[in-house]
C-alpha cells in the first residue's frame, strides 16, 4: 500500500515554490513587454495626432490661398486696394508673433424673387489667419498662472460692404457665412507665409506684396510648427526645428515633440 501511494504523490513544496517563481517571472516579462509596446504605440499615435492637426490646418489654408483673387466674369464691384488677393504681414517667431495672411476672393448670390436680370449679385470675402498668444496654463510651472510659450491660430471671414466701401462687422452684416475670430488650433509654435513671384524670387516686405505688385504673387510657402500638449520624450534634450524663414529656427531644451509641416500653394487665379 505504501508503494502505491508513493507512485501517485503530488508535487513537493520545493517544486511548487519553483513553479510559482517561474510563473511570476513569466508574468513580469509579459507585463514588461506589454508596457514597452503600449508606450511605443502611444508615442506613435500621439505623434500622428499632432502631425494630423497641423496638416489639417495647412491643408485648409492651402485651399483658400488657391482661391485668392477669384472673381466671377460679370463681377461689377469697384476695384479697391482693400481687395488685394493676398496680404502677408510678417511676424518674428516664437515668443513674439507669427505671420498673418489675408485672402480675398469673390462670391455670388442668387435671388429668385428678383426681376430677371437682377437675380445675381456679387460679393467679396476676406479670410484672415492670424496668431494670438495661447491662453493655456503651463501645468509644469508651480502657481498655475504661467501661460505656455506658444500661439493659437484664429480664423475670421468678413464681407465687403459696397455702400460704405469697407469690410463689414460679422456680428451685424446679416450674412450667416461670416464670423469673427474663431480658434482653429492651439499649441502652435510658429506660422510662416512666404510669397514668391513668377521667377521664384521672394517678395519681400511687410505687408507683402505692395499694392503695385498685388497680382505678382504666383505661389506661397506655408509652414506651421505644432507642439505636443504634454511631455513626449522621457528626458530633456536640445532639439531644433529649422524654419523656412531666416532667423526663426526654434531650439528648445525640453521634453515636448514639435512637428513642422510645409507646403507650397499656387495662386492659380492671379495673373490670368
Residue ranges and their predicted role:
Residues 7, 73, 197:
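Acidic surface patches and DE-rich sequence motifs
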